[in-house]
Curated annotation (Swiss-Prot):
GO cellular component: cytoplasm
EC category name: transferase
Protein family: Belongs to the phosphate acetyltransferase and butyryltransferase family.
Reaction catalysed by this enzyme: acetyl-CoA + phosphate = acetyl phosphate + CoA
Main location: cytoplasm
One GO term of the biological process aspect: acetyl-CoA biosynthetic process
Any GO molecular function: phosphate acetyltransferase activity
Enzyme Commission number, as recorded: 2.3.1.8
Record-linked InterPro entries: P_Ac_Bu_trans (IPR012147), P_AcTrfase (IPR004614), P_AcTrfase_dom1 (IPR042113), P_AcTrfase_dom2 (IPR042112), Phos_Acetyltrans/Butyryltrans (IPR050500), PTA_PTB (IPR002505)
Pathway in which this enzyme or protein is active: Metabolic intermediate biosynthesis; acetyl-CoA biosynthesis; acetyl-CoA from acetate: step 2/2
Gene3D superfamilies in alphabetical order: 3.40.50.10950, Isocitrate/Isopropylmalate dehydrogenase-like
Location relative to the cell: Cytoplasm
Protein name in the entry: Phosphate acetyltransferase
């Protein structure tokens, strides 16, 4: 799996730079990240300010940072496009209201190819970031949902945890999509021979219940598809994580690596708790979340994100836009 430093180096070598829109330009962290992206030749930031009075002189005087001030921005084209996209679900009056919100402007910039990707969430909820993306940018063909992943990193260990942030209790069919999105993400990061474990409190029928059936059915659907990766489940975390334990608990398991690349959690409770245990008790760095399944990259920040968190997420978002 590519490290962040390797991804950063790849961005620096790209002759054509991608643009990333930040709807929360009033944040000093966002402004610092924008300057860093320019200084290190990683991407082209677009900063959305609510008012022209908010734009600091060092941003205003930096010709490599584009600014858009909503108090001076004509939203008519965006409002008309929003009404078309919503197909009768929004009037022009509703469109006018939502186009006063920076996240909606940012998503529309991406939709109309005036920006390549978007990063928000430092001062907004996940819903406030993802809702405009779903309404305007939409999901990729073949997907009915968006999903999220964290890259859990410690030394040479790198794992993908999904879905820890978006889907509360996914159906079997949604778990299939969540797994497929995570596999595609792993491949984009140069993971070879991808393996995914679909987690449960049961290993290969050792436990019973509706939640076990939901995961087991997802695995059956995945195994029925033609694919170039390995998936297995339902499986408990200890068996998934450690091959010796797996060999005892799950005979003829198709997972061959010591530890699989992807851990698919059965619901948001397990995923959210799981990544935070790995982070706080296990000493893993949680990079993300990254939103998957959208037509163009939009990512969501934690409201407690630091400069480094925002920069790393911006770098990954730009990388995914190529």
């Amino acid at each position: 799996m590519y490290t962040l430093e390797e991804i950063k180096n790849q961005l620096g070598l790209k002759s054509e730079k991608k643009s990333i829109v930040f709807p929360e330009a009033e944040s000093e962290i966002i402004q610092s990240v924008a300057k860093t992206l320019v200084d290190e030749k990683l991407g082209l930031p677009i900063l959305l300010f609510k008012s022209s009075k908010e734009v600091p002189s060092e941003i205003k005087n930096n010709s490599s940072i584009k600014t858009i001030c909503l108090d001076e921005f004509d939203t008519k084209e965006f409002e008309e496009e929003f009404v078309k996209l919503r197909k009768g679900k929004a009037t022009i009056e509703v469109a006018h209201q939502v186009m006063q919100l920076p996240n909606y402007i940012g998503a529309m910039l991406v939709k109309l190819n005036q920006a390549d990707c978007m990063l928000s969430g430092l001062n907004n909820t996940t819903a406030d970031t993802i809702r405009p993306a779903l309404q305007i940018i939409g999901t990729k063909p073949g997907y009915n949902i968006a999903s999220s992943i964290f890259v859990m990193s410690k030394g040479n260990e790198n794992y993908i945890f999904t879905d820890c942030a978006l889907n509360i209790k996914p159906t079997s069919e949604q778990l299939v999509e969540i797994t497929q999105m995570a596999v595609d993400f792993a491949k984009a990061l140069n993971v070879k021979n991808v393996e995914a474990a679909l987690l449960s409190y049961s290993t290969n029928g050792s436990g019973k219940g509706e939640d076990v059936d939901r995961v087991h059915q997802a695995v059956e659907i995945l195994k029925s598809k033609e694919k170039d990766y390995v998936c297995e489940g339902e499986i408990q975390f200890d068996a998934a994580f450690d091959k010796k334990t797996r060999d005892k608990k799950f005979k003829n398991c198709s997972l061959l690596k010591q530890t699989p690349d992807i851990f698919v959690f059965p619901d948001i409770n397990a995923g959210n708790i799981g990544y935070k245990i790995a982070q706080r008790m296990g000493g893993f760095e949680a990079i993300g979340p990254f939103v998957l399944g959208l037509n163009q990259p939009v990512n969501d920040l934690s409201r407690g994100a630091t400069f480094v968190d925002v920069l790393n997420t911006a770098i990954m978002t730009l990388y995914l836009s190529y």
